[in-house]
UniProtKB/Swiss-Prot annotation:
One of its GO terms (biological process) is translation. One of its GO terms (molecular function) is structural constituent of ribosome. The gene is rpmJ. It comes from the Bacteria. It comes from Rhodopseudomonas palustris (strain TIE-1). Belongs to the bacterial ribosomal protein bL36 family. Keywords: Ribonucleoprotein, Ribosomal protein. InterPro entries: Ribosomal_bL36, Ribosomal_bL36_sp, Ribosomal_L36_bact. The keyword Ribosomal protein applies. This is Large ribosomal subunit protein bL36. The lineage of its organism: Bacteria, Pseudomonadati, Pseudomonadota, Alphaproteobacteria, Hyphomicrobiales. GO terms for cellular component: ribonucleoprotein complex; ribosome.
Length: 41
């Protein structure tokens, strides 16, 4: 999982990327291409 300051650029890289908030943190998840997983930090 990548840790990035800004998730907006990662979100546009694949059309199945989803922005999810869990435990106060923002995550980008992708069910088909798992390599796009990221957390804002």
């Amino acid at each position: 999982m990548k840790v990035r300051n800004s998730l907006k650029s990662l979100l546009t890289r694949h059309r199945e990327n989803r922005l999810v908030r869990r435990k106060g943190r923002l995550y980008v998840i992708n069910k088909t291409q798992r390599r796009f997983k990221a957390r804002q930090g």
